[in-house]
């Protein structure tokens, strides 16, 4: 997403141009009741959409009047059912959360995973009330429209996200050391000693660990055992990404959209599908789709 100026500044410094997603990427689908349903993009399209039943749509509108929650935190599932109703949770919130985290909304902390949503209820007492007030404030100040989500436009690069990594490697040159596994970290003087698998020790005053929690847990055992223990308890869902390429004429649908997500209640074996060649140009050879 292009809502982080520092990322765009880095791309500019590396002399690589961001590639914005196509207009088709705005169309997103949910597989429900045996068919693909277009996600509503506006309040009007939501009212006329058949993704939710009439009762389900009315229940979402009742959110405006629903009482404020009393708990300091709750799961995303509990929050969604309480404020939006069971049907909206199952068909909208569940697949949305799975698409972002690939996890179970029944165990996701609302405050940690969706702080903007938590703050809307906490500050305004209602998601709808909060959105209306934020939109009015944004209009007065001349800002772009705001939302409860991260906002921004989906952005990549001509040769994919790997282009930024390759450009960073070229920019850093000998200052970058790759292919060496970090075995452990320990305190040394006023800084840290980083032990690598090839026997080399790197000493530094500042250390940033940008790895999965389970890897950081192993690295930090000798430095901070309590922190290592906490990191080891953070759950990670097991996810596989499978890429399929087809000749365009073999696909009946024109794949005009971002892709689709599947609610857990549908009991399918996949979380969803992204239509990469529809999102960004150059992701598949001519005559093919990815």
Briefly describe each language-model feature range.
Residues 1-4, 70, 158, 267:
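Short, solvent-exposed loop/helix junctions and linker helices
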Residues 1-68:
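Dinucleotide-binding Rossmann-like beta1-alpha1 core, especially the glycine-rich loop
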Residues 4, 11, 93, 220-224:
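Short, flexible helix/strand-to-coil boundary loops that buttress conserved ligand/catalytic motifs
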Residues 5-6, 95, 214:
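Alpha-helix/helix-capping structural signal
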Residues 7-8, 165, 270:
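A general structural signal for well-ordered alpha-helical segments in protein cores
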Residues 18-20, 86-93, 228-232:
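Short, surface-exposed acidic
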Residues 59-185:
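Active-site/ligand-binding neighborhood in enzyme catalytic cores
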Residues 178-289:
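Mid-domain catalytic core of redox enzymes
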């Amino acid at each position: 997403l292009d809502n982080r100026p520092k990322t765009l500044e880095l791309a500019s410094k590396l002399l690589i141009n961001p590639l914005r997603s196509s207009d088709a990427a705005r169309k997103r689908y949910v597989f429900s009741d045996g068919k693909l349903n277009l996600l509503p993009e506006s309040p009007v399209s939501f009212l006329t959409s058949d993704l939710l039943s009439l009762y389900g749509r009315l229940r979402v509108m009742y959110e405006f009047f629903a009482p404020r929650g009393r708990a300091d935190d709750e799961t995303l599932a509990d929050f969604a059912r309480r404020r939006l109703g069971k049907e909206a949770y199952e068909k909208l919130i569940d697949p949305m959360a799975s698409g972002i985290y690939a996890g179970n909304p029944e165990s996701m902390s609302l405050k940690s995973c969706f702080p903007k949503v938590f703050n809307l209820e906490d500050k305004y007492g209602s998601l709808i009330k909060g959105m209306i007030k934020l939109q009015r404030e944004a209009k007065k100040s001349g800002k772009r429209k705001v939302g409860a989500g991260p906002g921004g436009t989906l952005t990549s690069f001509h040769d994919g996200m790997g282009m930024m990594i390759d450009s960073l490697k070229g920019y850093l040159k000998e200052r970058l050391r790759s292919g060496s596994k970090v075995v452990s970290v320990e305190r040394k003087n006023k800084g840290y000693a980083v032990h690598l698998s090839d026997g080399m020790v790197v000493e530094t005053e500042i250390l940033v660990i940008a790895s999965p929690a389970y890897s950081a847990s192993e690295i930090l055992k000798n430095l901070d055992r309590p922190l290592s223990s906490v990191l080891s308890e953070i759950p990670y869902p097991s996810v596989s990404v499978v890429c399929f390429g087809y000749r365009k004429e073999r696909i009946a649908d024109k794949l005009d959209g971002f892709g689709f997500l599947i609610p857990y209640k549908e009991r399918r074996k996949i979380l969803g599908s992204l239509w990469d060649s529809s999102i960004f140009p150059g992701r598949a050879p001519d005559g093919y789709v990815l």
